[in-house]
Amino acid sequence: MVLDLDLFRVDKGGDPALIRETQEKRFKDPGLVDQLVKADSEWRRCRFRADNLNKLKNLCSKTIGEKMKKKEPVEDDESVPENVLNFDDLTADALANLKVSQIKKVRLLIDEAILKCDAERIKLEAERFENLREIGNLLHPSVPISNDEDADNKVERIWGDCTVRKKYSHVDLVVMVDGFEGEKGAVVAGSRGYFLKGVLVFLEQALIQYALRTLGSRGYTPIYTPFFMRKEVMQEVAQLSQFDEELYKVIGKGSEKSDDNSYDEKYLIATSEQPIAALHRDEWLRPEDLPIKYAGLSTCFRQEVGSHGRDTRGIFRVHQFEKIEQFVYSSPHDNKSWEMFEEMITTAEEFYQSLGIPYHIVNIVSGSLNHAASKKLDLEAWFPGSGAFRELVSCSNCTDYQARRLRIRYGQTKKMMDKVEFVHMLNATMCATTRTICAILENYQTEKGITVPEKLKEFMPPGLQELIPFVKPAPIDQEPSKKQKKQHEGSKKKAAARDVALESRLQNMEVTDA
């Protein structure tokens, strides 16, 4: 995931100041731009020198051939005049004045210079790339500039009644319908581990089927993705920080051969966006085939580093969940990708409207965008039991930022175009099932249970098409209040004190009797 290097090159029409400004608006280090420009300038000089050295090497070989044809003596003289050692000014005439043995020596020296130049070029290329991959995409003009998403995310629109309050939160409701095993899940899988069971398994499958049907009717091709990716491919779709904060590493045998002792490093996917982004890696996509729209279905795995203490109960924020994703490859021309961006968020909105989930759409501030996103809109549902908006959907246009690293090009072949262009890539959540279940539970709770949303009834089994009944008490109703806890602790202390006093009196009585 990177920007076009020509954007940093003034002689190619680029504007480093614009990228520096983008970094500042993202509240990231603008000095990376200057470091990249410096490394790139030195790299280009190094490559120019290497090209000239290779030309000189070929000239040496050609001159030797001409002299051999003339049957000039080879001799053993390998001394090289000082003026010839300055390869930048070496000419064909200067070489012609040398003996064959001297030219051979010059060619060897040129070989050494080429090797040295190549080593320097590789070093500069690595330095340039280290800076390039940490510089974010150019921002869309409509992105709010701020580093505080809690205060400055811009609400674009609201749908439904986002003021209504209800009694229970999803943390209690998943227990009340007996659809969740949290403590046992944590024993088996660790923190945030869970078993989804019974009615919530049916509700999850209903959401998956309804989401896939909805996207299928809009021209999306359903696709079930791999759950893990090779390290070198994941590096092309994920930014560096994700490897530390989000992705799980999987170590396995290098091959299926029993005598193979090598090991292979893979990463579990955090979203189906990652493998779908790599689906057309190293391909040319024809204009007439675009847009290509995929409805990705996968299990997702996230470490959630940095989320310590947040949403530790229930199924809203977990390490493993199912998700249906919109993913689109679009033309880079005529504002097509931005039209698609609006279409994708609209598709998500219509899905949640059909489920009767109130929400608002927020334009995410620049400081909270990942490197790839030029703009991101979130759909945050209203949770009436929790009294809060919670994110269900993220919709991003990454323009050509991802495609450039993956080498997914637009058009026929390089020969047909003046300059290689790259497709635009967009992604949007359709339904992260556990989060959507939480939203449904809170919005559709009644005194007796959870009313099944109209659109999901046909996907639910007999007996659960109208109402998911409560079969257990709410945990919050079983927990003693702080006052009750304090009174109970006080009573325990008083009782303990009485026991000590009684024991003391009994001992005194025994002494007196004796």
From Swiss-Prot:
Residues involved in L-serine binding: 271, 302, 325, 427
One Gene Ontology cellular component: nucleus
Keywords carried by this UniProt record: Acetylation, Aminoacyl-tRNA synthetase, ATP-binding, Cytoplasm, DNA-binding, Ligase, Nucleotide-binding, Nucleus, Phosphoprotein, Protein biosynthesis
Catalytic activity from the UniProt record: tRNA(Ser) + L-serine + ATP = L-seryl-tRNA(Ser) + AMP + diphosphate + H(+); tRNA(Sec) + L-serine + ATP = L-seryl-tRNA(Sec) + AMP + diphosphate + H(+)
A single BP term in Gene Ontology: negative regulation of angiogenesis
Gene3D superfamilies: Bira Bifunctional Protein, Domain 2, Serine-tRNA synthetase, tRNA binding domain
Region of interest: Disordered: 471-514
UniProt region (Interaction with tRNA), positions on chain: 9-61
Modified residues (N-acetylmethionine): 1
Chief location of this protein within or outside the cell: cytoplasm
Pathway involvement of the protein, from the record: Aminoacyl-tRNA biosynthesis; selenocysteinyl-tRNA(Sec) biosynthesis; L-seryl-tRNA(Sec) from L-serine and tRNA(Sec): step 1/1
Signal peptide residues on this chain, from the entry's feature table: none
Quaternary structure and partners: Homodimer. The tRNA molecule may bind across the dimer. Interacts with SIRT2. Interacts with METTL6; interaction is required for the tRNA N(3)-methylcytidine methyltransferase activity of METTL6.
Protein name per its UniProtKB record: Serine--tRNA ligase, cytoplasmic
